[in-house]
Amino acid sequence: ELQFIGALLYNKLFWILFGVITLIYGYKKFNFNIVKETKSKRKQVQKLVAKSAHVNSDIEIPKAKKQYGLQYKWTQLKEFSWFYFISICKQPSFWGIVICGMIIIIVNSVNLGTVYGVDSYPTTYFIVEELQETSYFFFIIILVFYSGELVWKERGAKLNLIYDATAMSSFVRLAGKFIGLNLIYVVLIVALISSGIVFQTISGYYNYEFQVYFNGFFLEILPVLSIFTCLAFFIQSLVNNKFVGIILVIVFSIVNVAIAVLGFDHDLHFFGGSSLGAYSDMNGYGHFLQPYLIIKLYWFLFGILLLIIGSLISVRGNETNLIKRIKIAKYKFSKPLLKFTDIILFTFIIIGGFIFYNTNILNEYWSNSEATEFRVAYEKELKQFEYITQPKIVDVNLQLELYPSKRDYKVEGYYMLKNTSIENIKAIHIQKLLEENVTIDSISFEGGFTRNNQYKKFDYSIFNLKNALQPCDSVKMYFKQSFTTKGFEQGNSNSNIVYNGTFFNNEQFPTLGYNKKYELQDEDERREHNLSKRSRKANIDDPKELVNARSGGDSDGIHFEMIIGTSKDQTALVPGDLLRKWTDNNRNYFHYKTTTPIINFYAIVSADYEIKKDKWMTNNKGITEPVDLEIYYQKGHKYNIDRMMRSMKASLDYYSNNFSRYQYQQLRIMEFPRYATFAQSFPGTIPFSESIGFVLDIDDEKDVDMAFYVTAHEVAHQWFAMQVEA
């Protein structure tokens, strides 16, 4: 139990006292007046009278030239945008918010990519994420508060009637306030970027990556702020009450997040759209950036429409009744504004249609309820096949063509299936990966077969063999499969197959029999749909489960061979000895083959790598044999490569002496993008996230050497999983 004593108690008391004092001081000193009165009214009047006595009443006032064209409106927009920007900068309340925000950022300090208490080097993407996280709510405070202040600025100063009588478009007025507030965001963003660069410099890190700063703030934070600012101005214009408007903006923001959690998260109706996602040194923003920008443009155009509507129904003059303001709105709709609105509306509809075409036609969109119903139906209809006797995969021989720039692949080859049971097998059940981009182009079996497509909606096929498979007999299953990327999907789609740093495993390929991973997982939802409770662990002597006890349930161990092709700048890696490497048709090819059986669980990795190589010597019955040690890493991520290499050697020494001989001729570590934050062991290969060890800033005197530790942990799995189960 955590006890509030000692330093923890004093810390909490200090900040509570600080907060109370700040609140009292702010309450006493805060002033909503636009102009601070530094002199008494009597002195101001005396000064004005004294000045007027020296004024020449015969001064000739020049004639004003009347202009009402677009150039005139553009000039107004620029001047008023600058005016409102400066007016906010001059307000003490604004700098009070900024100073409080900076204090909290400093107090929270900077924890960058912490892994078990070990910070990472101050890479730009870590700095950007930290600044985004700590400053986001202060941006929201400024947005909510100053959108109300700007809409009510003239009425707060009681100059609204004079202001409303000017020959100025209501839209230009509101747009000027909108741009002025966005300029405030830009200034704060520049300040945050500058502080990030200063922090990197002080920390001795000089790879600033300005494009990452730009993307993180000007493509991610600023568009969201602009879209919500449009909404805030619309609400303030609609309700005609500053404080009610502020509350409604806050309530809307909360509800918007809540409905997304409840499943209404499609980018076409989730206000503002989804976030950009993580940046990776290996893959940048990858394929996520283009759809993100399209969706943000869609919502920005919607925000402009809200701004136009807000300007039309805004209070101008003495009329405050909403119904009457709506009736008056048509008289404010000038021809230039109407044309501008038509262009915005037309573009908004076209982009919305384009998004719908990509997310709902080219790709399939499932709501949470639809996905749940599918899982329920899958289990109710196919559960009968869970323990049906099936052959085991004993050989895998594949040729994979990977196209990183298109995010596609094509694979063909065969599985050798062996009947390891004592029963005749008349039908083989095949489950395709339930992903729309994956297509099984063909499947065939030696000796002839017929296909039962009764469960096609689940991508589950039953192949009735012409000749039943006798115990200990084998049959080859030939197949061709492709993964084809079509447009863009809803949300941050597939992060396994990317431009640089592809990492997926053999779950992509056809599997045998019923697959429990497609069952409904949540126990409450299972009860609602009358499904039995799932058992986390089977009894140790359960004969049905013992048949499929290994990690690859459809295999007891395989001989593996693959030829894999990838783009010319990349290296493709899978388990096994590298028999041959060559280039053909401007593509790199690699031929791998295992010399000992492995579990049916292997990874495919491809990226543009730097390589560090070494050797470790193993003793096999008195004969010394070399094991190739290789670390494939992103250029610039060499900070902890030596630690990882030492860990590989030390781990192999210890485990070989205390467990058994290491069974492969190589051990490879391959870095993959930080879309996931783990390392995972496969036979002879260890895919390793760039965020979990490669950029850790390890202090040998005070930190746990996490790069060494994680590597040692994963190497241990080469025995406890890879060797035990193979």
Please place each PLM-identified region on the residue numbering.
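Hydrophobic helix-coil surface modules that form long, contiguous segments used
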Residues: 72, 76, 80-83, 92-112, ...
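N-terminal, polar/Ser/Thr-rich
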Residues: 336-408, 525-537, 547-554
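A surface-exposed beta-strand-loop module
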Residues: 424, 435-500, 548-549
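Terminal transmembrane helical anchor/hairpin motif
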Residues: 1-29, 36-37, 242-328, 359-364
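Glycine/proline-rich low-complexity spacer/linker segments in large multi-domain proteins
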Residues: 366-369, 481-556, 614-616
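Helix-loop-helix units of permease transmembrane domains in multi-pass membrane transporters
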Residues: 148-184
